[in-house]
């Protein structure tokens, strides 16, 4: 029985990529800087001491990062019995965003330029917002700027609740984000507004519209809920997910995967929120998955809760939780199963600003007859998609080189 389990540690980069200078990210290193902060006692909130990831280390994380950066991260070294194949991958796509990383990993790199709202204030064209408001029957909006999602709730959440005006904001990514209170504005109203916005953005080539629902009564307790929804464009070509589905296989999305691929190539969607819930749901799906199945999970908290919020201790604690549960996953794998752990970009919690960082991502592969050892530097995330196609004996993808 052949299956592939993909565990996407959203934003878990392993060092600045060769083209990082083009993105202002030279020196960024999500994994390395977290490990360094832990070793120096600077990440002892909710946890303490050096970063402890023994299971990821056995799968080759420390070695993959060493090959990427030229040095082992603090607390990681050669004194580990490797059980997995490991490498690091350069992104071929033009952006450092979520859709680009995910699509490329599935065999379809983004070779065009996304549209962006580059102005930090008055970010959105009036012509665009006028059309959105008219169609939605709204008399105004708040925000219209680059912002941290949590900070903008503190600044504008109460005014939003009083006025009923949605909060529009963006970032360095190709994204239009809309924050609204679940009770005072209504979740269905937020989703409808996002659907309208997605349609009106067609001429702008924006990658995603993101619904950012929140609850609470004031700045001290405003919090995003688990009802986030991404409205993505469809990938420009068939991904390996589409090809497996067309061949009669199953593709199970856990978390936000289905949204990222605009439901293309997905046969089942499982909703889950938070690291524990996502891990539980992944294990449950693997236990019940049959032959020719992909179970694909995005562990978004690493990015949204820790990377963007520049929370080093939180990121470290999340990684240690994830690592402690990996033996549960390994115990479920058959000899023909393929487990892949990777990321879609970096988001160094020690870096300036709040945006993603252009980094190599780890490629940790276990099972399917792979020998423990180095896979080297991969020239594209698409090598993962090509390897999955090879594993299932599907028609080869147009991009990528298999390591199977």
From Swiss-Prot:
Instruction: Report the record's Gene Ontology biological process terms.
Output: 2-deoxyribose 1-phosphate catabolic process; 5-phosphoribose 1-diphosphate biosynthetic process; metabolic compound salvage; nucleotide metabolic process
Q: Which domain of life is it from?
A: Bacteria
Keyword Isomerase listed? The answer is yes
Where is Mn(2+) 1 annotated to bind? 10, 344-345
Pathway(s) this gene product operates in, as recorded in its UniProt entry: Carbohydrate degradation; 2-deoxy-D-ribose 1-phosphate degradation; D-glyceraldehyde 3-phosphate and acetaldehyde from 2-deoxy-alpha-D-ribose 1-phosphate: step 1/2
Record keyword Lipid metabolism present: no
List UniProt keywords, sorted A-Z: Cytoplasm, Isomerase, Manganese, Metal-binding
Q: Under which name does UniProt file this protein?
A: Phosphopentomutase
Gene source species: Shewanella sp. (strain W3-18-1)
Q: Which gene encodes it?
A: deoB
């Amino acid at each position: 029985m052949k299956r592939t389990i993909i565990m996407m540690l959203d934003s878990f980069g392993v060092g600045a990529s060769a083209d990082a200078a083009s993105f202002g990210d030279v020196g960024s290193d999500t994994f390395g800087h977290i490990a360094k902060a832990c070793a120096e006692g600077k990440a002892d909130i909710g946890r303490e001491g050096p970063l402890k990831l023994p299971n990821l280390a056995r799968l080759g994380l420390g070695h993959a990062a060493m090959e990427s950066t030229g040095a082992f991260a603090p607390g990681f070294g050669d004194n580990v019995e490797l059980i997995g194949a490991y490498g690091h991958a350069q992104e071929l796509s033009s952006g450092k965003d979520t859709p680009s990383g995910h699509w490329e990993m599935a065999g379809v790199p983004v070779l065009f330029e996304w549209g962006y709202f580059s102005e930090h204030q008055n970010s959105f064209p009036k012509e665009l917002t006028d059309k959105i408001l008219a169609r939605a029957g709204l008399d105004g909006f708040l925000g219209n700027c680059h912002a941290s999602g949590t900070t903008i709730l503190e600044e504008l959440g109460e005014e939003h609740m009083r006025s009923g005006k949605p909060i529009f904001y963006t970032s360095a990514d190709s994204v239009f984000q809309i924050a609204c209170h679940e009770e005072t504005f209504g979740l269905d109203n937020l989703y409808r507004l996002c659907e309208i916005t997605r349609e009106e953005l067609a001429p702008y080539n924006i990658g995603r519209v993101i619904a950012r629902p929140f609850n609470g009564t004031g700045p001290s307790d405003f919090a995003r809920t688990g009802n986030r929804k991404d409205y993505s464009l469809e990938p420009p070509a068939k991904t390996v997910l589409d090809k497996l589905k067309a061949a009669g296989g199953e593709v199970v999305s856990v978390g936000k995967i289905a949204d990222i691929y605009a439901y293309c190539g997905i046969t089942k969607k499982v909703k889950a929120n938070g690291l524990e819930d996502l891990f539980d749901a992944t294990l449950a799906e693997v236990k019940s998955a049959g032959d020719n199945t992909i179970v694909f999970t995005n562990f978004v908290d690493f990015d949204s809760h820790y990377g963007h919020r520049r929370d080093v201790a939180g990121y470290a604690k999340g990684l240690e939780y994830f690592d402690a549960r990996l033996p549960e996953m390994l115990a479920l794998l058959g000899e023909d199963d393929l487990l892949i752990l990777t990321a879609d970009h970096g988001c160094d919690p020690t870096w300036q600003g709040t945006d993603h960082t252009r980094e190599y991502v780890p490629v940790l592969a276990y099972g399917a007859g792979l020998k423990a050892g180095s896979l080297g530097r991969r020239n594209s995330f698409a090598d993962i998609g090509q390897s999955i196609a090879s594993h299932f004996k599907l028609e080869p993808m147009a991009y990528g080189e298999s390591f199977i």
